[in-house]
Amino acid sequence: MSRKILVTSALPYANGAIHLGHLVEYIQTDIWVRFQKMSGNECWYVCADDTHGTPIMLRAEKEGITPEQLIARVHGEHSRDFAGFHVGFDNYYSTHSDETRDCANDIYLKLRAAGLIETRTIEQYYDPVKQLFLPDRFIKGECPKCGAKDQYGDNCESCGAAYAPTDLKEPYSAISGAKPELRTSEHYFFKLSDPRCEAFLRQYTSRDNGVLQNEAANKMQEWLGAPGENKLTDWDISRDAPYFGFEIPDAPGKYFYVWLDAPIGYMGSFKNLCARNGLDFNEYFKPDAKTELYHFIGKDILYFHALFWPAELAHAGFRTPTKIFAHGFLTVDGAKMSKSRGTFITAESFLKTGLNPEWLRYYYAAKLSATMEDIDLSLDDFVARVNSDLVGKYVNIASRSAGFITKRFNGQLAPATAELPAIKGIQEAASRIAELYEAREFGKAMREIMALTDAANQYVDSVKPWELAKQEGKEVELHAACTNALNLFRLLTVLLKPILPIVAEKVEKFLNIAPLHWADTQSLLAGGHAINAYEHLMTRVDPKLIEKLVEANKESLAPAPEAQSQQRHAEHQQNEVTAESPWEPFCNIDDFMKVDLRIVRIANAEHVEGADKLVRLTLDVGNNETRNVFAGIKAAYDPAQLIGRLTVMVANLAPRKMKFGLSEGMVLAASDGEGKTPGIFLLSPDSGAQPGMRVK
């Protein structure tokens, strides 16, 4: 029975070019979608540009154009690049659309009606020149820990320290250079910490539920905490004007944070497709839908897609994703993509250099699995593998046999030898390879297909049509040998069609056949079938083209300030390598042991009146002793939810007199210095730890 499937890829941010890191996901998704369609399933593939946010607004202003003009131009560039790599979206849309706005408003109003939206007053830095509130990455100053200048508002790239923007010394706006002012503003929060959300997410993200890969499910349980320990924090879903995005209903001057409406862009894009194609939107998004919904994403945006997004959908009365498939990042020659080395390669430059996009599609397929492991693009291996597998093995079968059919047999085939072991081998393996495609184990599928290709070539080598053609009286044998070779080639083309759609089209034209489907692996071309003249299908990779590509992508390592501020976006690209190491210099064990790390229990936690970031913690450090500590975690944790929790503190840090009192230590928390994963995460020891125990 045919399945009804809706598939999405993450939305690329409309503030930069598509590069080879992005293409891992879109090629992976496209292969899976093409396989589903070949298998007879009704499968729709939608995506869109992620178009909202402060960086879009500022870049448009810098270019002297409107945000609408900027996103329209970038949409054209992205569409061109995806088409160049044969990514076959059924709809590639924009989040800046009426459909997405309507869906965002609908979800928000339903969450509000369910009591899952609340307002809070927060304190933020404000740029008096640009007259806007500044995101953390748009504030710079001196690091409060090491004194390094020109550091961002959330972490120091010199010493790695994480802090609140208000901790910066001599802060200034990265946009105007002005000294920012602290101002209060009312913000809107989605109550992810609500017991209803927690209970739903514990079940939804569990390994037993099967929505996530095991490693992703394990990560979700870390973020949720142990049963009875709700580590979820409420999510700030609003931003203040001026902001390029959708205004929140009944809240003039307040806008949805871009990450609120970005995944809703999946719905908006599909709604647009439904209107054009006469599809039923509700059939795919009603809570009891029998259809299937799959999201392909990078592992760095799991937090949004596996926690916020399904919680929003479930409590707004929509279905949740059937499965969420997360993949790893791309490295090039074993390292992060780097502009200085020329390995931060854009899709446009790859195509302009003259490289065949199907070479990359095949190489990625050969490396991809169903896990979240990173994959490496080794440029030397890329050349060797494509030349060996695609040209030397696969295409070689047709090039060694087709010409004889055209020249000697008027383009007509003989009856195929159905019991030929190489033919039977492909037909018997087809269902197994289909299972690998379904499971996204593309690398395993490619290995099986290449083994079958080797067997096909062994058959051609054994019958030697080029020698039969020289011998008188061998016409029947030659005709049969070339017919069998072309039938083998056709069967292999079916198996490779999700990877090589353009080559498959050329093969269909050359063999004079209808578009191939997966079921065609079980049939052969009939005797007397007429084929067309063979035309060359694929050339070898010239290593000089790779050298040209690398040179074309080399540029200064110094990123533009605007590019540095894009850390939070939905685009799951790897950031280029910087000259600084992300690790601290080595210390010896004696230096480490000078830091007295202790397990503590949070005996009490309360807001600090007049402080926008601080929570006052009373810590039980064991031996009936308590310490008073101020922690900059207000944006991440409700103080009431911290009481009773175990964490880790630096017990021998010199007391520090603050405006609000004396701080007698420091609790430890983690944050993503690159901004890919938002939030602050208080450290927790394993079960069994007791206050006063030393960490060593």
Swiss-Prot record:
Belongs to the class-I aminoacyl-tRNA synthetase family. MetG type 1 subfamily. Its cofactor is Zn(2+). A motif ('HIGH' region) lies at residues 12-22. InterPro entries: aa-tRNA-synth_I_CS (IPR001412), Anticodon_Met (IPR041872), Met-tRNA-synth_bsu_C (IPR004495), Met-tRNA_ligase_1 (IPR023458), Met-tRNA_synth (IPR014758), Methionyl/Leucyl_tRNA_Synth (IPR015413), MetRS_core (IPR033911), MetRS_Zn (IPR029038). This is Methionine--tRNA ligase. Its EC number is 6.1.1.10. Keywords: Aminoacyl-tRNA synthetase, ATP-binding, Cytoplasm, Ligase, Metal-binding, Nucleotide-binding, Protein biosynthesis, RNA-binding, tRNA-binding, Zinc. GO terms for cellular component: cytosol. Residues 556-580 are annotated as: Disordered. SUPFAM superfamilies: Anticodon-binding domain of a subclass of class I aminoacyl-tRNA synthetases (SSF47323), Methionyl-tRNA synthetase (MetRS), Zn-domain (SSF57770), Nucleic acid-binding proteins (SSF50249), Nucleotidylyl transferase (SSF52374). A motif ('KMSKS' region) lies at residues 336-340. Is required not only for elongation of protein synthesis but also for the initiation of all mRNA translation through initiator tRNA(fMet) aminoacylation. HAMAP family: Met_tRNA_synth_type1. The gene is metG. ATP binds at K339. Binds 1 zinc ion per subunit. The keyword Protein biosynthesis applies. Its main location: cytoplasm. Transmembrane segments: none annotated. Zn(2+) binds at C143, C146, C156, C159. It holds the Pfam family Anticodon_3. Residues 591-696 form the tRNA-binding domain.
